């Protein structure tokens, strides 16, 4: 079972760039592992650090600003997560501590992979995202509340509605990944297996 996602209130970091691809999110040289942990240290590695080893933080990159340390909601521009289909991208984001990404649009494969890893991709209009960028930049350290049950983002004195399809919403609310979904049918699977001839078991 994955962690249930119902509501999250967190610090927002504004990454004001469009077409952020998966190679920028987690560069290919860090993809040797197949477990989901440890990738957060290399998130946006080529932007966060001035050296290849990741030891010299880039003071001009927004994730390194003191006011955004501990951010768990990422605000970005359109076509977030484009490029190759590596699932390591949501792994890196969640391992770093992000629970939500808000953007006008997402690459399809990244969007699906996010739900598989309990990272909530929230799609709002360009105009709404513009408003949120202005709000965050005027109020560094502001927190948003993201309510998956109600499908709303509460930011400042405004509320923004978003839509997640029923199946994915059900899975996130109940902490169901692919294994969890399969285990929901464990009894039916066992009954089916018991009906098979012995030589097929």
UniProtKB/Swiss-Prot annotation:
GO cellular component: 3-isopropylmalate dehydratase complex
Keywords per UniProt: Amino-acid biosynthesis, Branched-chain amino acid biosynthesis, Leucine biosynthesis, Lyase
Record pathway: Amino-acid biosynthesis; L-leucine biosynthesis; L-leucine from 3-methyl-2-oxobutanoate: step 2/4
GO BP terms: L-leucine biosynthetic process
GO terms, molecular function: 3-isopropylmalate dehydratase activity
Enzyme's top EC category: lyase
Signal peptide (residue range): none
Entry-linked InterPro entries: 3-IsopropMal_deHydase_ssu, Aconitase/3IPM_dehydase_swvl, AconitaseA/IPMdHydase_ssu_swvl, IPMI_Swivel, LeuD
Catalyzed reaction equations: (2R,3S)-3-isopropylmalate = (2S)-2-isopropylmalate
Enzyme Commission number(s): 4.2.1.33
Record-stated family: Belongs to the LeuD family. LeuD type 1 subfamily.
Subunit organization: Heterodimer of LeuC and LeuD.
PANTHER family the record matches: 3-ISOPROPYLMALATE DEHYDRATASE SMALL SUBUNIT, 3-ISOPROPYLMALATE DEHYDRATASE SMALL SUBUNIT 2-RELATED-RELATED
NCBIfam families: leuD, PRK01641.1
Function: Catalyzes the isomerization between 2-isopropylmalate and 3-isopropylmalate, via the formation of 2-isopropylmaleate.
Name of the protein in its database record: 3-isopropylmalate dehydratase small subunit
Gene designation: leuD
